[in-house]
Amino acid sequence: MKKIVIATRGSKLALWQAEHIKERIMQQYPDSFEVELLVLKTKGDIILDVPLAKVGGKGLFVKEIEEALLDGRADIAVHSMKDVPMELPQGLTLGAIPEREVPTDSLLSARYDGLDALPQGAVVGTSSLRRQSQILAMRPDLEVKWLRGNVQTRIRKLMDGEYDAIIMATSGLKRLGETAPFHSELGPPLFMPAVGQGALGLEYRSDRQDLAEMLAFLDHRPSRICVEAERGFLFGLQGGCQVPIAGYAVMTGDNSFELTGLVAELDGTAVIRRTAAGTEADARDTGLTLAAQVKAAGADAILQRVYENGHASPQA
């Protein structure tokens, strides 16, 4: 029986995602493979006392995992697509993208039922400049406070009273079955998700054609098309996952989609949003074109201010 090693981070959510892919492989190929997990710590897991946007560098949550692929310790890596840099290391490729989980964000609170119920000056926790900029655009009277840690840690801090509300990805909450006394979704078109949010991606060495064929059953074409368009938009802006950039594509037909991209000032005082239509064949190019439109509307100046003020680094 052939052994397959899946590299993953050690958080509860990352382990859930890796176990999910492991189970799918074993269901598809019963008695064909022995599947093991290789649990690794990444830079993003180790540095917990600094906001992610200020840590800098590419691939905060993937670099160590990619090294395991390149040196042969692992065969497959399971990533949250929002954490995957636009440019992969030489010798690696992104293969199947399984069906995407809901891409929205969620507002959790112990006392307040939704964004409108938060009192003036309420403290909202998030680790994301994208979430910060959008929540302040909707409610400039709120105070945004830095929040790091895994899903359970963040919810514990909320319940301990450190925050009046926190914002987290809905997909992670659903996968782990976590919530809070009050839970409301923040989603498109009012609140835009990160590029690739809710989607998983499988990475492996480019010379492993056997893995490309073996994992093809996991690929969900609509999810792949949409994520490819979103990543084209992010690449066109030379942005990483720790910047105030949002992008979300939705299928409008079997081969067509609509992509919306957003860049916002950190204090929410300016929000640039544009939409474009595309097809599977030009998914990435549609994202690049939309990025150029957003740049022309002022996004370049906004992102430059973010970088100059040390809030984030390009291509994080």
UniProtKB/Swiss-Prot annotation:
Gene (UniProt): hemC
Protein role: Tetrapolymerization of the monopyrrole PBG into the hydroxymethylbilane pre-uroporphyrinogen in several discrete steps.
InterPro entries documented for this protein: HemC, Porphobilin_deaminase_cofac_BS, Porphobilin_deaminase_N, Porphobilinogen_deaminase_C, Porphobilinogen_deaminase_C_sf
Gene3D superfamilies per UniProt: Periplasmic binding protein-like II, Porphobilinogen deaminase, C-terminal domain
Coiled-coil positions: none
GO BP field: protoporphyrinogen IX biosynthetic process
Family: Belongs to the HMBS family.
Protein name: Porphobilinogen deaminase
Organism for this UniProt entry: Oleidesulfovibrio alaskensis (strain ATCC BAA-1058 / DSM 17464 / G20)
Keyword Lyase: no
Catalyzed reaction equations: 4 porphobilinogen + H2O = hydroxymethylbilane + 4 NH4(+)
Subunit structure: Monomer.
Other remarks on this protein: The porphobilinogen subunits are added to the dipyrromethane group.
UniProt keywords, alphabetically: Porphyrin biosynthesis, Transferase
